[in-house]
């Protein structure tokens, strides 16, 4: 199920690229009211023109690097599809079919003072509900440019204080 986690049994290297701040947005939909039913998750990869432009720029850069004298001498053959010799249209099609996340999805319950543009308030309380807070990476209004561990810990620290304050007001 997760082919990227399998170790290859041959020598090779990868020239990769990824957007640090993609503009494309996906969505999560509940298919039923049953708690054990899985939601429908559409990550929406490459659904934004800016992300497609960034992909083309990165692809052109990798193509140029791959054709330098230094790498030309060590590249024997591509593994799988030869993206270096593919057209931009073929490359985009390949990426649409194969692109995945680097396992740090976030931003599905955005912080916003307005319930029409976000799920939680600046106190991390779910709009329209009482005594329900969300304190994880889903509240990020923007995707960070790096690993989300530190921002999640900061959110948890601040969220814990906010929840404590709110509960004290209730008692």
Region spans (language model):
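FAD-dependent oxidoreductase catalytic-site/capping-region signature
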Residues: 1-151, 159-171
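ATP-dependent carboxylate activation and anion-phosphoryl transfer catalytic cores
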Residues: 156
